[in-house]
Amino acid sequence: MRLLIQAIVLLWICSVQAQSFDQLIDAVEKGDTQKVAGYLQQGLDPNTTDAQGHTILMVASRLGRAELVSLLLSQRARPNRQTPAGDTALMLASLGGHLEVVRILVDSGADVDRKAGWTPLHYATFAGNPEVVRYLLDRGANKNAVAPNGYTPLMLAVRNGHVAAAKALLYDDPDVTRKGPAGETALALAQRGNNQELVDLLKRAGAAE
């Protein structure tokens, strides 16, 4: 009987915690800083993850909730936690173009670079966020990092037609001769996309046919 009671109590506790976490995520999505602070004061762990492995900090970063990001970091949310897919809060903020959040995360110790895999700079160039690109480069991001798909940040910007992001990268003099998985350069990608502005930009940066 005692074991049965313990099991029932444990299930009840888990149910309450899950419900509280769902409510916390809802508050984060709505940008309700006061409600989020209340849940944290009640002892809810800011590093708890949802079914997809996203922490509360990741959700707030993806949505650009700068005030909430600062609050969560002050409550010991870990900025370098990764999802099963390898995403971090900084990567999600970079993808969304949330410069203020990116700055807060980096100032709190978020890793700008990684030894392997996707980086925040890859995400920023892929999405075409030039201000984030410049900031990450200024903070030491590897301008020539090769993503798992074989592309550099410059190639990602060019392939997606992001002129401003490509310009932001070219100010830092990346390697314009690098080749992608099929042997294509950034210039070849620009030509394939019929983007004359990018073609001219790359040629001025030293890219050759």
Regions found by a protein language model. Name each.
Residues 35, 67-68, 100-101, 131-132, ...:
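Conserved ankyrin/ankyrin-like repeat signature
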Residues 50, 83, 114-116, 147, ...:
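Ankyrin repeat boundary/linker residues
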